[in-house]
Amino acid sequence: MTGEDERIEMEIRKRNGESVPFQQEKIFNAMKKAFDGQGKEIGSREMDEILATVLNNLSVTVPLTVERVQDEVERTLMERGHYEVAKAYILYREKRSALRRVRHTIARTVGDDSLDEVLRRIQMDFTEEVYSLAALQMKFESFCRPGMTEDERAEALTKAAVELTTAEAPKWEFIAARLLNHSFRCRNAQEWEGRGGDLYGRLRYLTDKGLYGDYILAHYTHEEIAMAEDFLCPERDELFTYSGLDLLLKRYVIQSRSRVPLETPQEMFLGIALHLAMNEGSDRMGWVKRFYDMLSRMEVTMATPTMSNARKPYHQLSSCFVDTVPDSLDGIYRSLDNFAKVSKFGGGMGMYFGKVRAAGSTIRGFQGAAGGVIRWIRLVNDTAVAVDQLGMRQGAVAVYLDAWHRDLPEFLQLRTNNGDDRMKAHDVFPAVCYPDLFWRLAEENIDAPWHLMCPHEILTIKGYALEDYWGTEWEKRYLDCVNDPRIEKRSVTVKDIVRLVLRSAVETGTPFAFNRDSVNRMNPNGHTGMIYCSNLCTEIAQNMAPIEHISTEVHTENGDTVVVTATRPGEFVVCNLASLSLGNLPVEDEAYMERTVETAIRALDNVIDLNFYPLEYARLTNQKYRSIGLGVSGYHHMLAKRGIRWESEEHLAFTDAVFEHINYAAVKADAALAREKGRYALFEGSDWQTGAYFEKRGYTSEKWQVLAKTVAVQGMRNAYLLAVAPTSSTSILSGTSAGIDPIMKKFFLEEKKGSMLPRVAPELSMDTWWYYKAAHLIDQSWSVRAAGFRQRHIDQAQSMNLYITNDYSMRQVLRLYLEAWRAGVKTVYYVRSKALEVEDCESCSS
């Protein structure tokens, strides 16, 4: 634009009555667009002449209005013979006028003038005809009834946008989120009126009300909180889908005791960041910003307990816990008590029952006295129902039993609908620990005998616990027990067990599968222990040991009699989880991924020291191993965005490369953290230190070899690093697909509290449509093979589901289990039959 020296200083009155400085550049740009739209070229000199004429004619107009300016542009274009351009400009004005009318009508009907700006932004950002606000207006007016309050009308408007969401118009879920966010912010402003002020004032108020942990303001100065407030990016609220924002406002942000949300989404992310960076030394506010950015950009999600409880008075941040149940009355009830305390604070549980004696075993030499594991599991079931996670939902627990345990047949019928109801436990999730020998026989000689024995009898007669061994050593001792006539055996065939497993899996989705030899073979900390089982969602694989009673003594203190019970803490596993949202990350950008992984690893490491532990046993184990579990979500989202089909070799090659780099970045970041903050206590002798970790995984390239040497010198901060959780809830928050699962459908309606909510595959469009194949339509062999490629790079395990249809035969399902075992996959989570609905675990949703 030329003629800058001829700028006219005056004001223009906008349509809302507001007077603002006149900007002649806007006239120039509008005319330029009109010419460009008609494919007409115009020289800068002629454009300046037209503009000068318009400005000269406007200079005598008082007051100057938007309509007067546009009328003058039309007249000048016509006078200079640009009829087609003038016509296009007139049509453009008419279109803009229609857009304004529909905005004003909706805002007036709701009774909220501030809504107009939100609707204007929606029109700017969603320009396709399918997202016309006229359609929203029609749907909205069909919901309006006489006597509705302003809040009810605003809710009806949001509902209208939700119901316009279809497979062909998926972005309505983003429009609905903006409308929901506007309604929320209006209510939130009213709630804080006269209370808060700046962020520090709001945090002080929440702290005084007992809703915010006082440790935040104790660790940060007023100036630091003010600096943190400057980090807030409210525009990132526009990343939410309706489902994600609705879930976040209902379950994650801080609420008053009357369930009114008091925290904005961005304040929630910032509060979590403030908590996780609390103990950082140098550049603490820099880490607050990095943590906030990764969360608010939805590139990383922390586990549900961390998202919900960080910054709160009871900050239980861990997702799952795993306990080894001892074979004693005191030990079993201690484990039940541990589960109750974990459940009270919202944690899920994995419990290993492989050491508990079988039904009919001896107690203090009395034959047939033991009731077996089923009776104890029923108590676990009742505890899960009774201790209902702060009144939100009942407890969740997976119970694990070895494939050679004498109570296995009854265990495999815990959740089935037939049989004696006194032997059922419908609210627990059974899982079986399989040795290699079992799968080898299932593959090579399924009619071979399989002998079920009691662990207590083996320990009494042989002097060792069979479950304490794995691999060839386990197999040697198993055969030794089989050949010992003193040990009572319940002999069946491998086929009998396989049939029970598959029947239960197809009917109930369980038992989960834990391939114990694959797990222990790749355990980087096998030098200090044994992994008996996994957690509730089958992604955790860490050393375990039962809590042991040492003594009970009576003392006198200050004249009072005190009973002191001493226990050896064992290894009570804790899962601290987060997930990389692969669908929202540039996974090909190695530098960006390394920075993101580094930030996530640091945040998880901080969880260990900042956590509120429901049990001292958990705290001791967590501080000894400092185990974390960085996983992923948005896996199918990632593939579809890149035009990669699930059932393709390209998928396998891509996932191999992506997960190798994630692992490389994680190990590199963890070694650097060890140099800065110190290594975990049991590093010496680990596979990390000896280099066996890298050798077992075939990491022979130069960069891996350099990293292996660095690790040997600097150590590792955390004993375990990677674990892929299901992310059923937090993937909704971040608008991506769950975990490593394929999507269920491109589009479906979910019934929720009497209304139907649309669920749309992430970024569904004509570009991604053909790459989103539904889970039950996918050849599951591809899923298993992909899991095998990923497993090489994951030191723990994956929540990997199998999706089957009614057409699957038992032999086909068995073949999938065998393929998983051969591929080195450590665990199999649910078998999701198309006719079966199974509950998602919310504890591990990272």
Feature-to-residue mapping (PLM):
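Function-dense linear segments that define catalytic or interfacial modules
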Residues: 254, 260, 269-284, 288, ...
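Polar, glycine-rich mid-to-C-terminal structural blocks
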Residues: 413, 426-501, 505-508
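Catalytic alpha/beta core of large soluble enzyme barrels
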Residues: 221-233, 237-246, 538-542, 604, ...
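Short, surface-exposed, low-complexity cationic segments
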Residues: 23-41, 115-129, 270-277, 738-743
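Core nucleic-acid recognition elements
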Residues: 2-8, 18, 44-270, 286-292
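Internal maturation/activation junctions in enzymes
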Residues: 294, 336, 596-619, 645-727, ...
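Terminal amphipathic helices with adjacent charged low-complexity linkers/tails
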Residues: 88-95, 102, 172-203, 434, ...
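Gly/Pro-rich turn-and-neighbor structural signature
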Residues: 260-330, 477-504, 508-513, 658-709
